[in-house]
Amino acid sequence: MSKDINLDTHITDLVNVFKWEDLKDVCLVVHSYGGWPGSGALEQIGDRVSSIVWLDAFKPENGQRGFDFASEFSRKAFLAAVEKGEPGRPSPTAEAFRVISEKDRAWVDSKTTPQPNGVAIQPIKLTGAREKVAKKTYIRAAKYPQPAFDQALAECKADKSWRTFEATESGHDVMVDAPQWLVDVLLQVS
């Protein structure tokens, strides 16, 4: 990991996958932090995306930063990492993400990696490409407390161009807690 990694790095990674794989007519599904690079990438690849699914994800607006929405745990971890000169901070645990099964929590924790500090401090540059996608869906994981996701769900419910779903029996990692439910929803909306 490098101190040079920022939000633009992740946006570029996503854009390049679309370009190099010549992807078109894609249903772009983003989860959690993925709402940031997903929103940024749509500014460049929106014409290749036929539908989007924001899965318990941030829905940033122009000029916002991830740090502005961070939980107390994430803010403390970020500031501690910066103070120590570390390029990244630990990921929250699966327990903090309210993963339901103890076995699944152990598996998720074995797969998480630190997140680069730079992704939280760079403001995002958006012109509205996300809102131009014809088919938009927001899925909220009901058992994970996150005010920014509650706000995103409320905004999407109020905007008739978005479909909304709530994973009532799932923590933040819906793909772990309710995989078949998620597959059914994705097939319905993509």
Regions found by a protein language model. Give the residues of each.
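Active-site loop/oxyanion-hole signature of alpha/beta-hydrolase fold enzymes
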Residues: 1-27, 43-44, 67-73
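Conserved loop-alpha-helix segment in the C-terminal half of the alpha/beta-hydrolase fold
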Residues: 142-176, 184, 189
